[in-house]
């Protein structure tokens, strides 16, 4: 009976070692699980960006309003007969804002 107990104990120790430190053990499982969580977070960010880009593409394909808005905002374009006014904050506000952004 003693040899069987010793054999079973040795088998248990070997199995525990394999579970904790062996290939595909608990350590590898936790590392891979962390990698999966990080990849899922990256995928979620990229999916949100893709959804935003697809929405913008649909908006641009859908009508002239989006194209006109983009031309006005990014290129400062105006329609014939319109006057473009740019409101510039006074120097003291610009200096205060510039000082806050460089901190």
Swiss-Prot record:
InterPro entries on file: Cell_div_FtsB, FtsL/DivIC
Stretches of the chain found on the membrane's Periplasmic side: 22-103
Record key words, sorted: Cell cycle, Cell division, Cell inner membrane, Cell membrane, Coiled coil, Membrane, Transmembrane, Transmembrane helix
Pfam families, per the entry: DivIC
Domain of life: Bacteria
Coiled coil: 33-62
Cytoplasmic face residues: 1-3
Main subcellular localisation: membrane
HAMAP family noted in UniProt: FtsB
Assembly description: Part of a complex composed of FtsB, FtsL and FtsQ.
Protein family according to the UniProt entry: Belongs to the FtsB family.
Protein name, per record: Cell division protein FtsB
Organism: Salmonella typhimurium (strain LT2 / SGSC1412 / ATCC 700720)
């Amino acid at each position: 009976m003693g040899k069987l107990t010793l054999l079973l104990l040795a088998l248990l120790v070997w199995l525990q070692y394999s579970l904790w430190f062996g290939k595909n053990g608990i350590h590898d499982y936790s590392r891979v699980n962390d990698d999966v969580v990080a990849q899922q977070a990256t995928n979620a960010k990229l999916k949100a960006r893709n959804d935003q880009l697809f929405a913008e593409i649909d908006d641009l394909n859908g009508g002239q309003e989006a194209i006109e808005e983009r031309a006005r905002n990014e290129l400062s374009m105006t329609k014939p007969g319109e006057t473009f006014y740019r409101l510039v904050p006074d120097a003291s506000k610009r200096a205060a804002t510039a000082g806050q952004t460089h901190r």
